[in-house]
C-alpha cells in the first residue's frame, strides 16, 4: 500500500469517527446551535491584559465570552488546555472537570476534536508561565468539523493545496492571514486617500459591447436576451472618461478587470485595478499623487517608508526617479552597443531588435520596436521606484502627444523591483486625433495583432462634446499588495486565483 493510500485510509477512518460524533449530537437535539454571542476577540484580550499582573487580574474576576476554532489541545487528566483561534488571533483555554457542570467534561469536552468550533464563557487568569488564559465555566460546541486540520496542524506546505483550498491555508498559516489583511488595508487606504482628495467613487460596466481602455485579449461571452456577443472588460478607462465629459471631474474606481492571457507569478486573468481621472491636471500631477499615495500606504500599513521585498529594499520616503523610455534604453543598453541613433530610425531599430533576438512583428512601427528593445534591455533594471516617461505614441493610443515631440506621449509607467505597478498619462482629448489612432489600432488588429484595441465610436462622439484637460492612471492592486506584504507571487495575494482544472 502506498503512502498516499495509507493517508487516505487514515483520513477516512478519522472522518467516520467524527461523523459518528455528529450523529450523537443530532440525536441530542440541535447539532449546530446559533445562539452563542461572543463579546471579546483573542487579540483584544491580549492587548488589554497581557501586561496585567496575574494576582490583580485574578482579583478582578473579568468574565468573557470567546469563540473560535480548536487548534491545539493538551489533556492532563481532569483538565485540558485548549488553544482556540478567531479572526484576530489565538487564546488559551483552561477547561477543568471541577469547573463545569457534572458530566460536561467527559461527555462534551471529551468528544471535541481539532478543528471544531466552540463557544466558551469564563474568567481571565494567568498561568504559572504568565500566559493569559480563560478559566472555562460554560462550554458549547458550535460546529463539528468532519475533516481534520491539515497534517494535524503541523502546517500546510503544499502550494497548490494552499491556492485551491484557501480556507485551509488561512486556518493554518498566519503569514497568509497577514497577507490578506495587508491587502485589505491597501484597498481601504486607497479609497480613503481619494475620497479625502475630493474624488467620487463610481462603478462602470463589467460587460461591454466594445472592450477598450487597454491593449489586451478579452474574454468573450454572449448575452442571450439581446443576442449579442459581449466582453468582460479589460479596463474601465473609456467609461470613466465619459464621466469626466459629463462633469464628474474627479472619479475613481476600484474593481476587477479581465484579460484572456497567460498566467504567471505576476499575471492572473482576473485582477483588481484602481483607475482614476482628474480634470485640469496633467501626468506630472499624477506622478506626485502616486508618490504621496504609496508613501502614505507604507506608513499606515508598515509604520515606515521602508518597504522590503525579498532581498530588495525600497525607501518610499525618497523622491522616485524619473527617466524617459529612450534614455533608460540607452543607459541600460550601452553594454549591448545600443546608441541613440538606433532608437530614432526604423531600419536601425529593427536591426537592433533582431540582433537582440526580438521577433519583430510585421504590424510594428518604430515605436513598438523601441518599446520591445526597452523591455529586453532596460525594464528589469528599474529596481528602485522609477517613473518611466515618454512612451511612443504608437503604443499609447489613448495618451496625449507631447508638445515638444509628438512621436512620444505625456505618459508614465511606474516600475518598482523591475515590475510595472502603474500606468498613467495626460489624456488625449482631441477627438480627431483619437479617431485616427483608433483607425490605426483597427489596421493593426487586421494585420494580426490580437491585442490591438477595438474602435469605440461612441467614445469618439463623447470626446467631440469636449473633454477638459485631464490625466488618468491605473494602479494594479494585486501587485501593490505583493509589494507591501512581501509576497513572491500574485497568487499569494488573490484569495482564489485562477487554477488549471484537475
UniProtKB/Swiss-Prot annotation:
| Pfam families tied to this protein | tRNA-synt_2, tRNA_anti-codon
Kindly list the positions annotated as binding Mg(2+) 2: 420
Q: Which InterPro entries match?
A: Aa-tRNA-synt_II, aa-tRNA-synth_II, aa-tRNA-synth_II/BPL/LPL, Lys-tRNA-ligase_II, Lys-tRNA-ligase_II_N, Lys-tRNA-synth_II_C, NA-bd_OB-fold, NA-bd_OB_tRNA
Q: Which residues bind Mg(2+) 1?
A: 413, 420
- Keyword hit for Metal-binding: yes
Quickly give the catalysed reaction. tRNA(Lys) + L-lysine + ATP = L-lysyl-tRNA(Lys) + AMP + diphosphate
Q: Which cofactor does it need?
A: Mg(2+)
- Tell me which EC number(s) this protein carries: 6.1.1.6
GO biological process terms held by the UniProt record: lysyl-tRNA aminoacylation
Instruction: State which residue ranges cross the membrane.
Output: none
The molecular function GO annotations come to: ATP binding; lysine-tRNA ligase activity; magnesium ion binding; tRNA binding
Question: Which UniProt keywords are given for this protein, alphabetically ordered?
Answer: Aminoacyl-tRNA synthetase, ATP-binding, Cytoplasm, Ligase, Magnesium, Metal-binding, Nucleotide-binding, Protein biosynthesis
Keyword hit for Metal-binding: yes
Q: Which domain of life is it from?
A: Bacteria
Signal sequence, renumbered to the chain: none
Q: Name one GO cellular component term.
A: cytosol
**By its UniProt entry, which CDD domains does this protein fall under?**
LysRS_core, LysRS_N
Q: How is the cofactor bound?
A: Binds 3 Mg(2+) ions per subunit.
Kindly give the PANTHER family that the UniProt entry links to this protein: LYSINE--TRNA LIGASE, CHLOROPLASTIC_MITOCHONDRIAL (PTHR42918:SF15), LYSYL-TRNA SYNTHETASE (PTHR42918)
HAMAP family recorded for this chain? Lys_tRNA_synth_class2
How is the subunit organization of this protein annotated in UniProt? Homodimer.
Q: What is this protein called?
A: Lysine--tRNA ligase
User: Which gene does this sequence derive from?
Assistant: lysS
Amino acid at each position: 500500500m502506498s503512502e498516499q493510500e495509507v493517508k487516505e485510509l487514515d483520513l477516512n477512518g478519522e472522518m467516520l469517527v467524527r461523523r459518528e460524533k455528529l450523529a450523537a449530537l443530532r440525536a441530542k437535539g440541535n447539532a449546530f446551535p446559533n445562539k452563542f454571542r461572543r463579546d471579546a476577540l483573542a487579540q483584544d484580550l491580549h492587548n488589554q491584559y497581557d501586561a496585567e499582573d496575574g494576582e490583580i487580574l485574578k482579583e478582578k474576576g473579568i468574565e468573557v465570552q470567546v469563540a473560535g476554532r480548536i487548534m491545539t489541545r493538551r489533556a492532563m487528566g481532569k483538565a485540558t488546555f485548549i488553544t482556540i483561534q478567531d479572526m484576530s488571533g489565538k487564546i488559551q483555554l483552561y477547561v477543568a472537570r471541577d469547573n463545569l457542570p457534572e458530566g460536561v467534561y467527559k461527555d462534551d469536552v471529551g468528544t471535541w476534536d481539532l478543528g471544531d468550533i466552540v463557544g466558551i464563557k469564563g474568567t481571565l487568569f494567568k498561568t504559572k508561565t504568565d500566559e493569559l488564559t480563560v478559566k472555562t465555566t460554560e462550554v458549547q460546541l458550535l460546529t463539528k468539523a468532519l475533516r481534520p486540520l491539515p497534517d494535524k496542524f503541523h502546517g500546510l506546505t503544499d502550494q497548490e493545496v494552499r491556492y485551491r483550498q484557501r480556507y485551509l491555508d488561512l486556518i493554518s498559516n498566519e503569514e497568509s492571514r497577514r497577507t490578506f489583511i495587508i491587502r485589505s488595508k491597501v484597498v481601504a487606504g486607497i479609497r480613503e486617500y481619494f475620497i479625502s482628495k475630493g474624488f467620487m467613487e463610481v462603478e462602470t460596466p463589467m460587460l461591454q459591447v466594445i472592450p477598450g481602455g487597454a491593449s489586451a485579449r478579452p474574454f468573450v461571452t454572449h448575452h442571450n436576451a439581446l443576442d449579442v456577443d459581449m466582453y468582460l472588460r479589460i479596463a474601465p478607462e473609456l467609461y470613466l472618461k465619459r464621466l469626466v465629459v459629463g462633469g464628474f471631474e474627479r472619479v475613481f474606481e476600484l474593481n476587477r478587470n479581465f484579460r484572456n492571457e497567460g498566467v504567471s507569478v505576476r499575471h492572473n486573468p482576473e485582477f483588481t485595478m484602481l483607475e482614476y481621472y482628474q480634470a485640469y491636471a496633467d501626468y506630472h500631477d499624477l506622478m506626485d499623487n502616486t508618490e504621496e499615495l504609496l508613501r502614505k500606504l507604507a506608513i499606515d500599513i508598515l509604520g515606515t517608508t521602508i518597504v522590503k521585498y525579498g532581498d530588495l529594499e525600497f525607501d518610499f520616503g525618497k523622491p522616485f526617479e524619473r527617466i524617459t523610455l529612450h534614455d533608460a534604453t540607452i543607459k541600460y543598453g550601452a553594454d549591448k552597443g545600443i546608441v541613440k541613433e538606433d532608437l530614432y530610425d526604423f531600419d536601425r531599430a529593427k536591426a537592433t531588435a533582431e540582433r537582440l533576438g526580438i521577433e519583430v512583428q510585421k504590424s510594428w512601427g518604430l515605436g513598438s520596436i523601441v518599446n520591445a528593445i526597452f523591455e529586453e534591455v532596460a525594464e528589469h533594471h528599474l529596481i528602485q521606484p522609477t517613473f518611466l516617461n515618454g512612451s511612443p505614441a504608437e503604443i499609447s493610443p489613448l495618451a496625449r502627444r507631447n508638445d515638444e515631440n509628438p512621436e512620444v506621449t505625456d505618459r508614465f509607467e511606474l516600475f518598482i523591483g523591475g515590475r510595472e505597478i502603474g500606468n498613467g498619462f495626460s489624456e488625449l482629448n482631441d477627438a480627431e486625433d483619437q479617431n485616427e489612432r483608433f483607425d490605426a489600432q483597427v489596421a493593426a488588429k487586421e494585420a494580426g495583432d490580437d491585442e490591438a484595441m477595438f474602435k469605440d465610436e461612441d467614445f469618439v462622439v463623447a470626446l467631440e462634446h469636449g473633454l477638459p484637460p485631464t490625466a488618468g492612471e491605473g494602479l494594479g492592486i494585486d501587485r501593490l499588495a505583493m509589494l507591501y506584504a512581501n509576497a513572491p507571487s500574485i497568487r499569494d495575494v488573490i484569495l482564489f486565483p485562477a487554477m488549471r482544472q484537475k
